[in-house]
Amino acid sequence: KDKSYIKRLENLPEKERKALLYGSWDIFEGQYFNEWNRDIHTCSPFKLPQEYKRYIAMDYGLDMLAAYFIAVDEEENAYVYKEIYQSNLIISRAANAIKGRINEDITAIYAPPDMWNRRQDSGKSVAGIFAAMGLPLTKSVNDRETGWYAVKEYLQIKEGKSRLKIFTNCVNLIRTLPALTHDDKNVNDVANTPHELTHRPDALRYFCVMHRGNSRIQSVFDYNEAESLFEMTDL
C-alpha cells in the first residue's frame, strides 16, 4: 500500500476518513451518530446465554409502536435481539403485541414518562392499562440530550468493539438509527423530523439512559390505578 496515501487519508476530517479509509459509507454530513459502523454495531442472531438479563424498551403512539428486546451481560454490554414495529394499534392491542412476543423473563419494560399521563377521554394512563394487562412499566428518563449521549456511549468503539450490538433481524432500528441528524437549533439534540425515523431510536434511548454508568433501575408502578383497571371491560 502507498503509505503516503494512507497518511493523507488519516488526516482527513472524520467523516471522509471513515468512508475512504475504512469503507464506512453509513455516514453523511449532519449525521448525529457518527460512531455508527454497521460491521461493529450489528451481528447475526445467536443464542444468548440464559443468565443475561432481559429488558424491553418501548415508544408508543397510535401512529407507531416500537419495542425492542435487549439482553445485557454481566459487563453491561447490550444485545438488541428482537424488534416490534407496528402502526395503528390501540393501547390494548399494543400491549398484546408485546405480550405475544415474550417467552423469557423480563427484568423491566422501559417507557417514556408521558405514558403515565392520564388521558382526557378516559382518565386512564397508558402505563395503567399496560399494568392491568400484566405489563407493569418502568419509567425511563426523558431528558433528550442525556439520553442521546447515553446512546453515544453505548455506540462508542474501543479496540474495535462497542457495548451495543443489534441483531440483523432488527431491520428498522438498523435503518433509522444511523439516519438521525442533528437538530438545526440544538446540535446536542436529534432532529425530530422526519418523525418516521424517531420512534425506534427513542425506544433505544429509554434503555441506554437507564443503564449509563450501571445506574440503578427504579421501577414506577401505580398499583392503585392498576387494581382499578383490572375490572375494566373496555380498554
Where are these regions (language model features)?
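ATPase catalytic-site recognition across NTP-hydrolyzing enzymes
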Residues: K1-M58, D63
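Hydrophobic/aromatic-lined pockets within catalytic cores
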Residues: E10, W25-D26, E74, C208, ...
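Short acidic/glycine-rich loop or secondary-structure boundary segments that cap or lie
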Residues: E29-G30, P45, M64-A67, L89-S92, ...
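Anionic group-transfer/hydrolysis microenvironments
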Residues: G61, D114, L204
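Short beta-strand scaffold segments in enzyme catalytic cores
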Residues: L65-A71, R205
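Mg2+-dependent endonuclease catalytic cores in nucleic-acid-processing enzymes, primarily RNase H-like
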Residues: E75-N192, N214-S215, M232-L235
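Acidic, Mg2+-coordinating catalytic module of metal-dependent nucleases/exonucleases
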Residues: P194-V220
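Extended acidic low-complexity intrinsically disordered regions
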Residues: D222-L235
